């Protein structure tokens, strides 16, 4: 199987250690591709809207964005790891996710995403882990992903992995290993189920695209939906 990992920071600290524990289950039989932000990611989105109005390849950071997207689309499992920075994901992670706005449901979602599975790993000192995960989960859901597992930890102690008590480390390792085992035994030849929330988003946007298409048949997003057959009876999860 193929796994693509997006690391919200280049630092090899607590979040990195947690991510490594999770990946241990997959090392022997998986092809793992990792990106460390910000060095492997795009710069800040400038809001030029070229990806929305015309083509994503017109983005100033298209080379890096398309490289990451290729890995995401080819992967069976997506892993996102981010510490909490002031109750949110890292700026580098947010910058990367912004560049995939054109893949949100109201625009041009990739049909491959509807069957994907994802794991989000976050950690914080006391609070902010869940809101950090939500920053990432919002994008994944609007990309069309339904199976999203959030694993979040409150350290309530040291922020240096080497200084965390062994008992706490063991607890963290046990939880991450348990989640990893569940995802390791999945038959990835079968796409994940698409839940009601994602389907609802799809049908609401479908009505919007149908309306926009009547006004302007050359509208970029409508043409994409129409070419995929989604305005008709074709569905990306079937």
Regions found by a protein language model. Give the residues of each.
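N-terminal beta1-alpha1-beta2 submodule of the flavodoxin-like/Rossmannoid cofactor-binding fold
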Residues: 1-109, 170-238
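Short coil/turn segments at secondary-structure junctions
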Residues: 6, 80, 120, 160-163
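A short secondary-structure junction signal
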Residues: 91, 129-134, 162-163
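Short, glycine-/small-residue-rich phosphate/pyrophosphate-handling segment
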Residues: 109-152
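Active-site rim beta-loop-alpha module in soluble metabolic enzymes
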Residues: 154-159
